[in-house]
């Protein structure tokens, strides 16, 4: 594939806001997990588990001009966009290439479903007359594309706008999609990334699958008993590579083994193929035999 540069990047998670906060926490071996203090609660008590919750979202309302997109997920998107100079990097790309040549490709698993949960919990009326409360009667929020639509309006990008929703792979696939848009000549720069926030559907859905650990998760440990859920938002700006670029997208691979609705192939064939295809692409770009 033609060289694609990563011109800017940022991340916000339970570890903190911005790349520096993530690095500091990793170097200090500090976890972002804490005892679950996020609703909705069953019988007055939260689900007994550990979560990675981003502090400050409850007080980080969107600017008034974006009120129709107001929800926890878009709040985190706005917070992440306003970190590490990401919003300015997108603005610079628009100034250089034009708004129609800057695309948005973002991934999300549940998007703004937390707002939909609240709307159903607060229905006005009964039976066939039940309606969402006025403050949540905003159709643009109750769709998986809420994130992509919000970011396009928030940044002013007017190129292709795509929201990828393929569960846990969503925010990885956007790099491949963004690179293809540039390769096809449909965009000169692409804002890629992903945002997912805590909500009842995620917490209780994974718990129903018996996948949520009651203790802090222990990835790769023989004693592991499940996962811990959290929320985070991260973005990168892709563009055609130029001399002197430090960071480039070396390659990507995608597959779908279609083994099971919620479980991978026992031998991980889908993941194997994706990684093999990505490595083969890197070798081709380096002029080596795949």
Where do the model's predicted regions map?
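Condensing-enzyme catalytic core mediating Claisen C-C bond formation in acyl metabolism
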Residues: 3-7, 24-38, 43-50, 216-285, ...
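Conserved active-site "lid/cap" helical segment
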Residues: 15, 20-106, 112-113, 274-289
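A glycine- and small-aliphatic-rich helix-loop capping segment at beta-alpha/alpha-beta transitions
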Residues: 20-21, 116-131, 151, 181-184, ...
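Active-site pocket-shaping loop/turn-to-helix segments
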Residues: 64-85, 135-143, 161-173, 218-234, ...
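Active-site-proximal alpha-helical scaffold in enzymes
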Residues: 87-92, 144-148, 152-155, 160-194, ...
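Active-site-proximal gating segment of KS-fold condensing enzymes and close homologs
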Residues: 108-162
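Phosphate/pyrophosphate-binding betaalpha-module
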Residues: 192-231
């Amino acid at each position: 594939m033609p060289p694609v540069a990563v011109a800017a990047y940022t991340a916000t998670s339970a570890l903190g806001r911005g790349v520096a906060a993530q690095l500091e926490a990793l170097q200090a071996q500090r976890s972002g997990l804490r005892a679950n203090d996020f609703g909705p609660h069953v019988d007055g008590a939260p689900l007994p588990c550990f979560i990675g919750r981003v502090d400050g979202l409850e007080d980080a309302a969107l600017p008034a001009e974006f009120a129709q997109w107001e929800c926890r997920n878009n709040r985190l998107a706005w917070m992440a966009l306003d970190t590490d100079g990401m919003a300015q990097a997108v603005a610079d790309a628009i100034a250089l290439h034009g708004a129609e040549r800057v695309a948005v490709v973002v991934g999300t698993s549940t998007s703004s479903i937390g707002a939909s949960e609240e709307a159903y919990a607060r229905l006005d009326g009964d039976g066939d007359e039940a309606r969402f409360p006025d403050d949540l009667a905003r159709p643009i929020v109750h769709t998986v594309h809420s994130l992509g639509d919000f970011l396009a309006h928030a940044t002013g990008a007017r190129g292709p706008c795509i929201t990828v929703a393929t569960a846990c792979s969503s925010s990885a696939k956007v790099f491949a999609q963004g690179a293809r848009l540039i390769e096809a000549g449909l965009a000169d720069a692409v804002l890629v990334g992903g945002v997912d926030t805590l909500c009842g559907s995620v917490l209780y859905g994974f718990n129903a699958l018996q996948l949520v650990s009651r203790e802090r998760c222990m990835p790769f440990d023989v004693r592991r008993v499940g996962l811990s859920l959290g929320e985070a938002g991260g973005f990168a700006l892709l563009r055609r590579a130029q001399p002197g670029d430090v960071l480039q997208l070396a390659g990507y691979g995608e597959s779908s083994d279609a083994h099971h609705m919620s479980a991978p192939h026992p031998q991980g064939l889908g993941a194997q193929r994706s990684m093999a295809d990505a490595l083969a692409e890197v070798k081709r770009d380096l002029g080596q035999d795949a």
